[in-house]
Swiss-Prot record:
Quaternary structure note: Homotrimer.
One GO BP annotation of this record: nucleotide metabolic process
Upper classification of the organism: Viruses, Varidnaviria, Bamfordvirae, Nucleocytoviricota, Pokkesviricetes
GO molecular function: dUTP diphosphatase activity; metal ion binding
Protein task: The viral dUTPase may play a role in lowering the dUTP concentration in natural infections to minimize misincorporation of deoxyuridine into the viral DNA and ensure the fidelity of genome replication.
Keyword Metal-binding in record: yes
Identification of the protein by name: Deoxyuridine 5'-triphosphate nucleotidohydrolase
């Protein structure tokens, strides 16, 4: 059985960057790059960026969590950007839109261009994905069915602990 990422655009804007397709990970890259779907200007300090996609990950036929990790292109000589929480951990039951909290550590705004990749997705257990399945925007897909975890965003699962 394989490790598969399922990506579904949720806006017309995202459809242009995520056309329906099944991509085979021939290079066996660990991370799946995620596009910015519009031009953005990140002000100094904290910025919240919607990615306009839903994502699910499946390993050995079972839904699993995944991580959002910075790509090396996020921090260059021209810009100093970091993920606010270091690594984003996405629960298997989360079915909402992916969003980023990015901190611009510089003193000036930073331009991000559409189709630029700042982050990548890595399957729980660091399993190399075999396929990336890009779904149609309005397609009904079982892995995005409502769950007790739901679509609650940053910090929505409550207090520390289980």
């Amino acid at each position: 059985m394989a490790t598969i990422f399922f990506i579904q655009p949720i806006t017309e804007e995202a459809e242009a960057y995520y056309p329906p397709s099944m991509i085979t990970n021939k290079r066996k890259d660990l991370g799946v790059d995620v596009y910015c779907c519009s031009n953005l200007v990140l002000q100094p300090g904290l910025n919240i960026i919607p990615l306009h996609i839903k994502v699910a990950c499946e390993h050995m036929g079972k839904k699993c969590g995944f991580k959002i990790m910075a790509r090396s292109s996020m921090c260059t000589h021209e810009r100093l950007l970091i993920l606010a929480n270091g690594i984003g951990l996405i629960d298997p039951g989360y079915v909402g839109e992916l969003m980023l909290k990015i901190i611009n550590l510089g003193d000036i705004p930073v331009q991000i261009w559409a189709k630029e990749c700042l982050v990548q997705l890595v399957a729980q257990g660091d399993h190399v994905p075999d396929h990336i399945n890009i779904l149609k925007r309005n397609e009904i897909f079982p892995l995005f069915a409502p769950t007790p975890r739901g679509e609650g965003r940053f910090g929505s699962t409550g207090k520390a602990g289980l």
